[in-house]
Amino acid sequence: MIDVNNFEYMKIGLASPDKIRSWSYGEVKKPETINYRTLKPEKDGLFCERIFGPQKDWECHCGKYKRVRYKGVVCDRCGVEVTRAKVRRERMGHIELAAPVSHIWYFKGIPSRMGLVLDMSPRALEEVIYFASYVVTESGDTPLDKKQLLSEKEYRAYRDRYGSTFQAAMGAEAIKKLLQDIDLDKEVDFLKEELKTAQGQRRTRAIKRLEVLEAFRNSGNEPSWMILDVLPVIPPELRPMVQLDGGRFATSDLNDLYRRVINRNNRLKRLLDLGAPSIIVQNEKRMLQEAVDALIDNGRRGRPVTGPGNRPLKSLSHMLKGKQGRFRQNLLGKRVDYSGRSVIVVGPNLKMYQCGLPKEMALELFKPFVMKELVEKGLAHNIKSAKRKIERVQPEVWDVLESVIKEHPVLLNRAPTLHRLGIQAFEPTLVEGRAIRLHPLVCTAYNADFDGDQMAVHVPLSSEAQAEARLLMLAAQNILNPKDGKPVVTPSQDMVLGNYYLTLEREGAIGEGMVFKDANEALLAYQNGYVHLHTRVAVAASAVNNATFTEEQKSMLLLTTVGKLIFNEILPESFPYINEPTNSNLEKETPAKYFVEKGANIKEIIASREEVAPFSKKILGNIIAEVFKRFKITETSRMLDRMKNLGFKYSTKAGITVGVSDILVLGEKDEILHEAQAKVDNVIKQFRRGLITEEERYDRVISIWSNAKDVIQGKLMKSLNKRNPIFMMSDSGARGNASNFTQLAGMRGLMANPSGRIIELPIKSSFREGLTVLEYFISTHGARKGLADTALKTADSGYLTRRLVDVAQDVIVREDDCGTDRGLLIGAIKEGNEVIESLYDRLVGRFARKTVKHPETGEVLVAENQLITEDIAHIVENSGVETVNIRSAFTCNTRHGVCKKCYGRNLATGTDVEVGEAVGIIAAQSIGEPGTQLTMRTFHTGGVAGDDITQGLPRIQEIFEARNPKGQAVISEIDGVIAAINDVKDRQEVVVQGEVETRTYAIPYGARLKVIPGQQISHGKELTEGSIDPKELLKVTDITAVQEYLLREVQKVYRMQGVEIGDKHVEVMVRQMLRKVRVSDAGETDVLPGTLLDIHQFTDANAKVLLQGKQPATARPVLLGITKASLETDSFLSAASFQETTRVLTDAAIKGKRDELLGLKENVIIGKLVPAGTGMNRYRKVDLVKTTQDDMNVENDEVYVEQ
């Protein structure tokens, strides 16, 4: 038996009239829907039961046959087959049209496919189809040309003159005749000949025509099928009619549109039977044509047909398009059963992998499992009584529920799901109340807080789904962020504050210099008030359980504080004892200066030493990363839970509060402001004398005030007491920063107006002093702009993510090694002298392409194809090596994806990437998710051209859409020397002298030069400040230069905003933008000049002709923006579900495209498992068996794969 869901590819094409009739179960002859008295469908109408099947299961129209035993019987009285009512979702009907009509997609699309096939203009076609002109279909022996248009008057004149020696007609019938007469092979040969000589517009037109004609020739579609003789009627359940409360009916718009077609069709039939005058018949045919147009795509031509209240009716095309269309609403996003949502509250007592599920919700979600268990335990006799027990909530139900949810993970999701950490799995524990409890450490990943956020719960049902949830999605498994490989579960707010307070040191605290034999004794002393948490004490090192101490150190005393003793208890034994927040202490061992000989004067030694800084949020993050690197995930998650508990406990003990008295106003503030004001007055004086321009005055005033603010900030931070609660909050990284503090206690400073230009009047007051009315008014400008920006940014960033996902969704790790011999030469990314991304960051987790040797000693640091770990990267960076050749996604040879070696390490797990990992989607999420943190601003620094470069989110969109950038730089097309810079008519010209030729570049007005005479310049380098247009760069240089430029630019934007993203994510996206080439000369291949081809398709076509010793084709690489690249993908399902649905489908149907179902979207649409992860063929054969608790040993969580 064939499996309906198991097919290799999906093909789309034009349907012939016979094909449409073969789909149909009967002809719809009447426009009636249902009888309003009996509420039964009318016979032969749009809801007819004889055509589409019965309305009720196993029951015919007249009621003669009822019950399932008559299955398959066709009633002799009403002709309805007795079957399930579900067939009304799949059975189609048809309408036999009295006159052929054209299909609006093929006639009206851009370019008009019908027009290209017939070589007629769309305007001429329109005149013929809508009965305004005649077209000559057979010229006979008259001087008329075939396809010539004739007006009514001309037609009459020629008829009188030549009689019936020629034929001309109107409407779709005429076009159909012309389409049937076309000899595709002859036309194609003729066009190929023409291409050899044609130039300009004629050449472009010929290429377009050739593409469409070749498509028809190769796909087996007949051009005449673009004209409809038969109209399919979609199943009635897809255009339902429902009764409302008041007895009125609500119906789908399609029924109205079908009704108009049937009415006009029947009237036309009657007129033809009566032999009505041709003018009336023509008018009726035109109306039929318009009715069919409205049904297929309402509003595409002329005014749309409207329903009640002047609302345009939704046609078949509208059912597919847009967010509410079939693709995005029903095929790509379905609502699921076994789900619930509720408000979240914090669950500080949960373990990392747990969540609290409200009892009533759990009972409803796990209902089938509970019912099964009730029957198995004999607590209920059958399923029905089990169901009744649950609905009445009888006490025994709760015990069963407890046992059912053990070992059964649930998925929690918070919208918006910006990256894969927006859905994670947890083990549920039952809680009272109606709120979901969430572990505080996973909030960062979800971006959740407890001010009323809601979350959704989903239950994985099959054992495979449960296994995947447990092994891959459990919150304790997702400790690292896929975008940069740094821990995402770092403590925040209270937890940070507690650990910060715990590790503080204070000079002269109670009991300073006491010596204890072990940690317990120190704790005892603390609990009895002899020492404080912050007291610096000594403990016998041998009693501190730590594997990194040497034998010598164990015989000494360790100087530390009571708080640090408590803090170090949470770390694994073999981890260094952390006494100071430095990397050397974290990675290697405790510094020797903290060990003293027994018998030394401890008090003196302690008194002579500085206080050691406490552990801030950043240090805690580093500790987590280090523990993760050395130990298993389980160990890390245990440590995180202990860190969380410590944090909450000691932030409670600390009792840190904020009061107005904690905000101390700086005494020297007035002095600083006076000085600044004097400088500003001086600048204004110079301006009035005409010594400086308006621009300069503005810039100087701005810089004076920002300097004043910086001075105040510096002095404030110095004058602050280290015990000040606000300082502790910002220093620990719990909340707030230095700038917030300056605004509270110093001055608010300069504000921007709504256009983003800085207002030169600063706000001199601080919040502690209070703002004047004018100052308050100025500050509202910036605040309002901030709120408006945030709202816009969220939508923009979401749309960016959607486009990124779409372009990269089929990039999957497909093989272990593609065997490429190319690599990418990388160094640190710099902007001026500032390093934006260091070489170390770019090397970690990549494979070396070529051996790296020490520049001085020549020893091999990294071998070819070796993974560069953190340690190796440090060694390479410190050796003074500037550039390293690595394997990169840019140079990967794998088709439809990348290989393991070129991708490198999976950032989310810190291990090698697995075959089947959907790295394209991960890349898209990693770039899109921080999008909301980028600013919307185009910074206006007083409008100096070249300075107004776009930054933030708009710049990222500019890069990925490959648009011409704002403030575009002029680039040199040749290597050479800057020979001269001349002034020509208030502009400048730069002359670049190369070895062979000299080029002169006109510099746009107001652009700032980047070069000086005599300077060496290479091709593709900027002559002026600004952003390079990557398309220009591609013309001048090669693909590699463009790839590196785009990568560098994206990293610049994100790093400037303090967001770190792994290079490999950007590489995957940029690679997708450069996948296509445009054929410039076809050689002796089958490809058409001017067409876009995938690089692999192009090389295949060339390989084929080269083997036969023929002339290969040539092509140029093309840079496509992500939207364009998504629409150019090979998969028509993916493209149609993205944007421009009708255009994509029209094109695909004519070409008879096959979708090979390689990407993820295509498979989601047709309901197959996605071909990534465990859905890949190589993993499909695995059988999962649910085991008991004893077998489930956490260490052995490998799943064995049988090939």
UniProtKB/Swiss-Prot annotation:
GO terms for molecular function: DNA binding; DNA-directed RNA polymerase activity; magnesium ion binding; zinc ion binding. Keywords: DNA-directed RNA polymerase, Magnesium, Metal-binding, Nucleotidyltransferase, Transcription, Transferase, Zinc. Zn(2+) 2 binds at residues 818, 892, 899, 902. Pfam families: RNA_pol_Rpb1_1, RNA_pol_Rpb1_2, RNA_pol_Rpb1_3, RNA_pol_Rpb1_4, RNA_pol_Rpb1_5. Zn(2+) 1 binds at residues 60, 62, 75, 78. The keyword Transferase applies. GO terms for cellular component: DNA-directed RNA polymerase complex. Its EC number is 2.7.7.6. Mg(2+) binds at residues 449, 451, 453. Its cofactor is Mg(2+); Zn(2+). GO terms for biological process: DNA-templated transcription. It comes from the Bacteria. It catalyses: RNA(n) + a ribonucleoside 5'-triphosphate = RNA(n+1) + diphosphate. InterPro entries: DNA-dir_RpoC_beta_prime (IPR045867), DNA-dir_RpoC_beta_prime_bact (IPR012754), RNA_pol_asu (IPR000722), RNA_pol_N (IPR006592), RNA_pol_Rpb1_1 (IPR007080), RNA_pol_Rpb1_3 (IPR007066), RNA_pol_Rpb1_3_sf (IPR042102), RNA_pol_Rpb1_4 (IPR007083). Belongs to the RNA polymerase beta' chain family. HAMAP family: RNApol_bact_RpoC (MF_01322). The RNAP catalytic core consists of 2 alpha, 1 beta, 1 beta' and 1 omega subunit. When a sigma factor is associated with the core the holoenzyme is formed, which can initiate transcription. This is DNA-directed RNA polymerase subunit beta'. It comes from Bacillus cereus (strain ATCC 10987 / NRS 248). The gene is rpoC.
